[in-house]
Amino acid sequence: MKVLVTGFDPFGGESINPAYVAVKMLPDEIAGAQIIKREIPTSFTRGTAEVVRQIELCQPDLVLNVGQAGGAAGLRVERVAINLADARIPDNDGAQPVDEPLVQDGAPAYFAKLPVKAMVRGVQAKGYPCQLSYTAGTYVCNAVMYTVLHTVQGYPHIRAGFVHVPYAASQLEGKAAGTPAMPLADITAALAAAIEAAVQNKTDLKEQMGRLD
């Protein structure tokens, strides 16, 4: 089995992006699966194009895109991506779309094609904070997640999804007191646990992880 794992380059004035730094630190094999690691640009246009190119090039069985969610206390396994670009800040190319569809006449939304609840429990079982999330935002992370899920409609054997990671502890300088973060080694280990659960579980757990908000 081949697993394509992507992380973004730095954006928003940050010197690093813990998503790709952690991805680079992953082992080359997890649960018997080959791990293919790629960096993609934080760009609505180039980021989505590059991840589609990598899918076509690598022909993976599973795709996990990883992004930074500053302010998150742990990993967030994303359940849904929406067909909307509404950027609070410009991307790395200076683009700042407002209320634009990602795919003209595309589906309003796609659900992740991964065992998201099993992934949450797998990360938690290793002692790392993790929760199921019902919004990947409206920035480039959501754009990549939506684009990948739209693309793999033509590749029924490919399973795909998205995980957000918190700030790395090394990014906290200059940020407000109490801003949550994790050591990069812990982010990497938590990602590995999520991938292991995704590889080992073809169907998801049947347990309550809903929200009231």
Question: What is each residue range found by the language model?
Answer:
Residues 1-136, 150-157, 177-213:
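N-terminal catalytic or cofactor-binding beta/alpha core of small enzyme domains
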Residues 171-174:
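A short acidic, helix-capping loop that chelates divalent metal ions and anchors anionic groups
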Residues 136-167:
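Active-site oxyanion/phosphate-handling segment shared across diverse enzymes
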